[in-house]
Structures are given as structure tokens and as C-alpha cells.
């Protein structure tokens, strides 16, 4: 196998990651509508902590750097909350 072949595989994985992030953002919009209808705030510290703890543990199980993976998910959670604010008319997204 050549390095170019492996890079093409990485590019495919990267494209799938982007698609999954977009799907996650769409789901965040659905969550926003449900939270708004129920009078719930965008930020839910208990849920955020549970997500990040779970991600940390899954990264350990997968034998990848859990701290780095947790940082990535901190960004994803922040993106989700911003999307939720945007759906409720309070966000800063373009």
C-alpha cells in the first residue's frame, strides 16, 4: 500500500466525520425546538457532564487519547448549544 492510498482513506474518514457533525447539528436544532417548547434552557450542565464523561470512557476503551477526544467533544457540545441558541433566535451563527 502506498502513502497516497492511505491518505485517500483518511480523506474518506474525514468526509464521514463532517457528515456526522452536520447530522449532529441538525439534531441540535430538533433539541432546541423541544427545549423551547418545554421552557428549558439551552445549557444543561448535568447532560454536558454526562456526555463528556461517557466520551472520555469510550475513548479509553478505544485506546485513544481520552483528553484529546474530550476536547473535541467540548467543541461539539459548544457548537450544539450555539445551534440551539440560533434556532431560538439568540445565536451568533451566520
What is the role of each PLM region?
Residues 1-94:
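Domain-level signature for soluble enzymes in the chorismate/prephenate branch of the shikimate pathway
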